[in-house]
Amino acid sequence: MMKKCPSELQLEAFIREEAGAGDRKPGVLSPGDGARKSGLFSPGDGEMSVLDQSTLDGSGGGHQLWWPESVRTPPRAAAAFSATADERTPASISDDPKPTTSANHAPESDSDSDCDSLLEAERSPRLRGTKSTETKRIRRMVSNRESARRSRRRKQAQLSELESQVEQLKGENSSLFKQLTESSQQFNTAVTDNRILKSDVEALRVKVKMAEDMVARAAMSCGLGQLGLAPLLSSRKMCQALDMLSLPRNDACGFKGLNLGRQVQNSPVQSAASLESLDNRISSEVTSCSADVWP
């Protein structure tokens, strides 16, 4: 059911009031009579109802309409108004809905075509913008892949170079470790040799001290002889010294009787042993003499 405009509702209320005025007794005024006599429009009780064509035309039985001069319309306007009312009644809409729908759909189709054209016009730059953005995205993706591939290759080359350097360093480390082992062995041998040399030096020092003592003793004996202490020695010691220094006659005679060849035949070992024994005897005698001099 179509919604009615306010003017139609007011018109129906006016017609309903007029129909009710015909049913009332003469001499009784309704609330809208003064308004009709003064030429004003009164909506009546405000009830909403739909009247048929006979009521609108005033031809219905017992429904005689009274139109004031101020509200009365010309015949042409009344005919046009009646035609408009017929078109807007629910009966006319229910009887012939096809022309109305076709009339309503015709401008809608035109408006739809216009909207489609406008949408296509709006979509065309959007589509172009979308294509451009898609192209940019694809190019960016390709460039990113290329850069990633180049970076992977660079990293692979760096990794291989580092691996070769590691292998080289490992070889150098092994060679240096071997050299360190050899050096440690040499150091150990040097330490051992140093200890041996130190012991040899100590032994030589002891020997040097012994030699110095012997030299001092010899010098002391020589000094005693030079100072004239020899006469102070006892006769016994002196005799012993003379007996030690003097040669026996038999030996002297023997030396006289010996020839040169026999003397040459004596071995140097025997001569060295005799000299050593002689030296020992001299040193012992000198020591005993010095002890007698300095008790």
From Swiss-Prot:
Residues 136-155 are annotated as: Basic motif. Its main location: nucleus. It is found in: Nucleus. Keywords: DNA-binding, Nucleus, Stress response, Transcription, Transcription regulation. Residues 109-119 have a biased composition (Acidic residues). One of its GO terms (cellular component) is nucleus. Residues 162-176 are annotated as: Leucine-zipper. Residues 16-26, 120-136 have a biased composition (Basic and acidic residues). Residues 16-157 are annotated as: Disordered. Residues 134-197 form the bZIP domain. Induction: Induced by cold stress in roots. SMART domains: BRLZ (SM00338). Plants over-expressing RISBZ5/BZIP52 showed significantly increased sensitivity to cold and drought stresses. PANTHER family: BZIP TRANSCRIPTION FACTOR RISBZ3-RELATED, BZIP TRANSCRIPTION FACTOR RISBZ5. Probable transcription factor that binds to the DNA specific sequence 5'-TGAGTCA-3' found in seed storage protein gene promoters. May function as a negative regulator in cold and drought stress responses. Homodimer. This is bZIP transcription factor RISBZ5. It comes from Oryza sativa subsp. japonica.
